[in-house]
């Protein structure tokens, strides 16, 4: 069985995102897969690329052939270099900057009240079970 590492297309028209999958080469593009090993969202800025490195290394070592696009993604993440023997291969994937945490304005009064836990009914429940067992 010839195994390929390729992209499985998901999403809407003109808004694609992909899963990096291991599948039989004869299977349909979006058909049955052996394993999902990553994600690729090309429409985000910068593109979101996530690959489970251990699983990619395993499948490459047992002979799975990556498609051209997946090979390019593996080169960006450094997995292709590690597979070819470069121990110093590093990921060159750019990541999005973290959003600053939201800080509520202390001058304004909060609209929503925080929930309070009702501890009293929960404490009464074990006592009720104990009285039923004695009866």
Curated annotation (Swiss-Prot):
The keyword DNA damage does not apply. One of its GO terms (molecular function) is structural constituent of ribosome. Signal peptide: none annotated. The keyword DNA damage does not apply. It comes from the Bacteria. Residues 105-120 have a biased composition (Basic and acidic residues). Keywords: Ribonucleoprotein, Ribosomal protein. Residues 105-135 are annotated as: Disordered. InterPro entries: Ribosomal_bS16 (IPR000307), Ribosomal_bS16_CS (IPR020592), Ribosomal_bS16_dom_sf (IPR023803). GO terms for biological process: translation. GO terms for cellular component: cytoplasm; small ribosomal subunit. Belongs to the bacterial ribosomal protein bS16 family. HAMAP family: Ribosomal_bS16 (MF_00385). This is Small ribosomal subunit protein bS16. It comes from Clavibacter sepedonicus.
């Amino acid at each position: 069985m010839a195994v390929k590492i390729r992209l499985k297309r998901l999403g809407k028209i003109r808004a694609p995102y992909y899963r990096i999958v291991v599948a039989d080469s004869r299977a349909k593009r979006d058909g049955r897969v052996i394993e999902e090993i990553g994600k690729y969202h090309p429409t985000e800025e910068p593109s979101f690329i996530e690959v489970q490195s251990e699983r990619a290394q395993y499948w490459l070592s047992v002979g799975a052939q990556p498609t051209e696009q997946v090979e390019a993604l593996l080169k960006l993440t450094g997995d292709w270099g590690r597979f070819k023997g470069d121990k110093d291969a590093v990921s060159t994937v750019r990541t999005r900057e973290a959003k600053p945490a939201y800080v509520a304005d202390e001058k304004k009064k909060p609209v929503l009240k925080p929930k309070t836990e009702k501890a009293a009914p929960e404490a009464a429940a074990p006592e009720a079970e104990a009285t039923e067992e004695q009866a």
